[in-house]
Amino acid sequence: MAEGKIIKALSGFYYVLSEGKVFQCRGRGVFRKQKITPLVGDHVEFQATSETEGYIMNIRERKNWLVRPPIANVEQAILVFSAVEPDFSTRLLDRFLVLVESKHIRPIIVVNKMDLVDDQTKPTMEQYIRDYRQIGYDVIETSTITKLGVEQLLSYLEGHISVFAGQSGVGKSSLLNALRPDLQLKTNDISTHLGRGKHTTRHVELLEIGGGLVADTPGFSALELDDIELEELPLYFPEFCERSEECKFRGCLHIAEPKCAVREAVESGKIPSYRYENYISFVEEIKERKPRY
């Protein structure tokens, strides 16, 4: 039986990439009975019925899946933020980082529009980049005008399924065009406003870029922390995890507990204060969330 990855789903057909060829496949009837929907990104076993067609027989276990966009087995999220226009937002970046890490997806931070950074903004921007690198995140500085960082970003895509995410206007389309010029995506084509009614499923496709597969639809269009419990939130702040062993209380949430090593690290400047402030704002958001029944 042949194996491959679903790179596109459209009108009941699934397009499976296998050894450089694409097969147009249908799912077995048993999937419908079991209410299983094959997703873009699924690793599947299929039976070829001709040179170009086949039937999906089995879907391998998924590492993860996203609801919006509907895609499975995402390995990394390219979080695109602009240094300016719109201004760099640590709160939004930290929100993305929490969501991405909660799905066991590797985040890669891209700071775009570095060519627009002036002398006034430069020291602040450089400090942010240093901070996130020190925490352990991969940070790539890019510019689609000077082509800064484009080759470096390409090397990160190889062999992985990636989604691009980030607010509107940060240059996601321009960046994808720089990575693969023949795409010619219109700027703002990759819309961040995907929710057009509850039951609308946006067509998703994986594009081959730099030896990897990249979703043509932005990931994490819904930014609510709905699936994250208060107790797990500190786990998505790596610099908190490093120090939580030294907290007096096991399961310390680093809010108001005595002898908290994380708060001490914030006070002594070892953890950036904005990271802690963002954490506390997420704590409040989760606490205020209405219980689901």
From Swiss-Prot:
One Pfam family hit: RsgA_GTPase
Keywords: Cytoplasm, GTP-binding, Hydrolase, Metal-binding, Nucleotide-binding, Ribosome biogenesis, RNA-binding, rRNA-binding, Zinc
Cofactor binding remark: Binds 1 zinc ion per subunit.
Cofactor annotation: Zn(2+)
Superkingdom field: Bacteria
RNA-binding as UniProt keyword: yes
GO CC terms: cytoplasm
Positions contributing to Zn(2+) binding: C247, C252, H254, C260
EC top class named in words: hydrolase
PROSITE patterns given in the database record: ENGC_GTPASE (PS50936), G_CP (PS51721)
Subcellular location: Cytoplasm
Subunit architecture: Monomer. Associates with 30S ribosomal subunit, binds 16S rRNA.
Family classification: Belongs to the TRAFAC class YlqF/YawG GTPase family. RsgA subfamily.
Record's protein name: Small ribosomal subunit biogenesis GTPase RsgA
The encoding gene: rsgA
